[in-house]
Swiss-Prot record:
Protein name: UPF0213 protein BCE_0033
InterPro entries assigned: GIY-YIG_endonuc, GIY-YIG_endonuc_sf, UPF0213_domain
A Pfam family assignment: GIY-YIG
Domain of life: Bacteria
Residue span, GIY-YIG domain: 4-79
SUPFAM superfamilies linked: GIY-YIG endonuclease (SSF82771)
Sequence similarity: Belongs to the UPF0213 family.
UniProt source species: Bacillus cereus (strain ATCC 10987 / NRS 248)
Length: 96
């Protein structure tokens, strides 16, 4: 996993909803979400599973991708993620 790279990511919450965000350390961010210290939205929908990630050269383009994704409806979001390379978890993230 690339560290300190700007990335746009999507997690699937326990209720099936998606949460999109930006980070420069993806593993740490997922652990933060699952520890209940992440975004307010995800705290009520634990655990979360990483579904998609895009690495970008700078913060600006990663945040533009996040903004674009958040404007889409659910069907469009699923199509967006299918067109890219989905993240295949090599590590289980737990709430412990």
């Amino acid at each position: 996993m690339e560290k300190n790279k700007h990335c746009f990511y999507v997690v699937e919450c326990s209720d099936g909803s998606y949460y999109a965000g930006y980070t420069n350390h993806i593993e740490k961010r997922i652990e933060t979400h699952n520890s209940g210290k992440g975004a307010k939205y995800t705290r009520a929908r634990l655990p979360v599973a990483l579904k998609y990630v895009e690495f970008h050269e700078d913060k600006r383009t990663a945040m533009q991708a996040e903004y674009y994704f958040k404007q889409l409806n659910r069907k469009q979001k699923e199509e967006y993620m299918q067109k890219g390379e989905p993240y295949v978890a090599t590590k289980k993230f737990s709430t412990k």
